[in-house]
Amino acid sequence: MITKLFLIGLLLAGMVSAQTPSTNDEKAIRQLVADFVEAWNKHDDHAFAETFTEDADFTNVRSDSEHGRKAVEDFHAPMFATRFKNTHQTADDIKIRFLSSDIACVDVRWEMTGALESDGTTIPIRKGLLNWVVTRHGDRWLISVMHNQEFTPRKQ
């Protein structure tokens, strides 16, 4: 009887630990943030879109929305070729909250320089917050839902 209880305990412990996110999961999500920023700074719409799931939902600071990785790529391609072609983005203050072993919410504060108005004038530094729902796909994490907000001067 004690052996059976011990084996059941081991089985349950294994099930619990299998559902607990690991430090590797946190590292993988932080790498996702790094990949996102790197793709942005290279103005590579394809690499940028690769950080999203095939069925991702994307909403930018102007409330423009796209659905799907291909739509995210197509949305960013003309901007990376024009008004965002000289932008540089940084990300910090990354907060990760695991909702399950395969789903996490991520907040990332960002700053961007080099954006242009439609008339070609440079926009001053922009700051904001990315809010993501990320999901595990094998050993990789991808953005399933993204909402982006730009801070007004008083919130910076």
Where do the model's predicted regions map?
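A solvent-exposed, acidic/Ser-Thr-rich amphipathic alpha-helical stretch
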Residues: L32, D45-L99, R109, P124
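Beta-strand elements of well-folded, non-transmembrane domains
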Residues: M112-S118, V134
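Structural motif
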Residues: L99-S100, H137
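A short acidic/glycine-rich loop-to-helix N-cap element
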Residues: S118-P124, P153-Q156
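Sec-dependent N-terminal signal peptides
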Residues: K4-G14
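A short hydrophobic beta-strand element
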Residues: D102-M112
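Short, low-complexity N-terminal intrinsically disordered segments enriched in polar/charged residues
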Residues: A13, S17-E54, K155-Q156
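Short beta-strand edge/turn micro-motifs at domain boundaries
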Residues: R126-R154
